A protein has these predicted regions:
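Substrate-positioning beta->alpha
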Residues: 76, 103-110, 115
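C-terminal glycine/acidic-rich active-site capping loop/insertion
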Residues: 83, 91, 110, 115, ...
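Beta-strand scaffold of nucleotide-dependent catalytic cores
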Residues: 31-34, 122-126, 149-150
């Protein structure tokens, strides 16, 4: 048997751990909706033909498997959503597409998600987001408020409330 090893690094950020803790304490109320997106632009052209880069194996289904973008970066978005909410995805409806001509596996994908406890979500993953570097973002909304975390600003956690002003926390510098 083959072994698949995957490091889920985004769940180690202090702001992500804070988001998870606040949801576990019920601060957002009953969760309703999750939006998680992972946007990269490095495969917006067929650079795998140039050689000497990671695109070669990532876009070759014989070497990477049949799941392109959704398997490469969508898995990180999926994990982040389940980690922070503490809920498992029970159902999904996905749409995968290879936009770059001649690419044999998906370079873009989206999925509607149904989590436990009747929470719904949307996951998008793309490697054809021209101009993007490595941008993962999650927003989670409950009946009392919502939160947002972006990997491009990893120490910042934004909390939005129904009945009070938005809070912007600088978590990486507050004793974590």
């Amino acid at each position: 048997g083959l072994v698949l090893a995957l490091t889920h690094v985004y769940s180690a950020y202090p702001a992500v751990k804070e988001a998870k803790a606040r949801i576990a304490k019920g601060e957002l109320g009953k969760l309703r909706r999750v939006y998680v997106e992972y946007t990269q632009g490095w495969l917006s052209e067929r650079i795998e033909l140039l050689g000497g880069n990671n695109a070669g194996w990532r876009t070759d289904p014989k070497r990477s498997g049949k799941a392109g973008c959704i398997g490469d970066i969508g898995t990180h978005a999926w994990h982040l959503s389940e980690y922070i909410t503490g809920l498992k995805v029970k159902e999904l409806c996905a749409d995968l597409k290879a936009f770059v001509p001649g690419r044999p596996i998906d370079d873009d994908g989206a999925a509607f998600l149904r989590y436990e406890n009747d929470v719904t979500g949307v996951l998008t993953a793309t490697q054809i987001g021209t101009g993007e570097a490595n941008n993962i973002r999650i927003r989670i909304y409950g009946e009392k408020g919502g939160l947002e975390w972006r990997q491009m600003e990893p120490n910042t956690l934004t909390l939005r409330w129904r009945d009070r002003p938005t809070e912007i926390l600088d978590i990486g510098n507050n004793g974590y």
